[in-house]
Amino acid sequence: MLTEAEKQQRYRMDDYYEYAHRPVMLKIERRVCGCDYGASSWTTKSEADLMANLLGIGPGSRLLDVGSGAGWPGLYLSKTTGCDLTLVDLPAFGLKMAQQRQTKESSDVSVWLALAEGAALPFIDNSFDAVCHADLLCCLVDKKSVLQACQEVLRPSKSMVFSVISVPLGLSDSDYRRALEAGPEFVASDDSYLSLLEQTGWTVLEDMNVTQSFLQLTQNRLDTERSHQDELLLSTEPETVKRRIIDLERRRDALADGLLRRDLFVVKSDK
């Protein structure tokens, strides 16, 4: 069950997807991330390629992308590896854009879309050979239930790869408040992700600290949006452009000061 704050976040996502698919925003995304999906995660093309290798997927594999948004990186992973793909998300607006993208690119792989919460996946147990999600858990309150649901639908001894932004343990009260202000809306967690993964029956194969590359990505995004500010103002309210710059500056500073981190996990089901 979604909290009221999560419901409000979902409503705002429709506005975000519309904004992210404006031509100038797609141009910025291509320059910074190497893709143009109007993505809601911070996954670059190079990181998506790494995810494909870590998942070990190929033709005949069934991949589940949870919280897939407009289809990045799931559609790209399916296109480059030949695996069959299922995209899951709420609300529907991002999935509609993913469907349009898939229709436009018309690949030979099978792609299914499901409107569902990550904590209540509508699939039978042991349905998938691989699971991925990109910066999803830091945008949800109930992180543990999502990890449990992914465990149930993944086949035994298969892998899940995901990225997540988190707040390091042991911060002072003032630094913790700064981290919450700079991170995604639900970045806070009572437990570390290593603990959450252990609690939900996952074995951690790799935990890659990708904070420095995320810091560089944030700086690149900030610089690129600043350089396109005049173009952005032609299609966007000045207050929105100003707020995005402030948010990027706040996140960059929090990352540089060690108040946020980003990890890429490779985990295996224990069942």
Where are these regions (language model features)?
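A short glycine-rich, Lys/Arg-flanked "PGG" loop and its adjoining helix->strand segment in the class I
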Residues: 144-159
